[in-house]
Amino acid sequence: MSALIINEYREQGGTAISFPEDISRARQKLFRFLDNRFDSDQYRENVRELTPAIMAVLPVEFRTRLAPQNDTMSLIASAMKECSEAKQAVLLNAPEHQKMKEVSEGIASLFRLMPEQVGPLMTMVTSMLGVI
C-alpha cells in the first residue's frame, strides 16, 4: 500500500516530499509521517500533502469511512457493492441472519440515492409488496 501511495503522489505531480528509491526506506519515511510520534507540525503538513494520493489509492469502503462521499458516483458505487453482496448471500444460501443483514444493507444503500424521498419510496415499495 505504501508503494501505491508514493507512486500516486509522484504521478499527481507531488514534489514537496522526496522519497528514497528503495521501497523499504520510502515505506519507513511514509510511516514516520503517518505515525507522527513527536507531534511534528512538518509531519502533519506532509500528511496533508499526501492526503490526495492516499485517498486515491484507498479502496472505496475505507475511503468513505475516512471522508464520507455524498456525490452521486460514490453513492451508486456503494449501492452496487451492497446489492451485489445481498445477491451473493442469497445465491450462496447464506445463513438467514447473514441474508437479512446483506439485503437490508442493499435496501438502505438504494434509499441513500434519494434521501429526500425515503418516505414516498417506502410507501411505494410496501404497496408494491402488498403489505399495505
UniProtKB/Swiss-Prot annotation:
The keyword Ion transport does not apply. It comes from the Viruses. Keywords: Early protein. The keyword ATP-binding does not apply. May be involved in activation of synthesis of the CI protein. This is Regulatory protein CII.
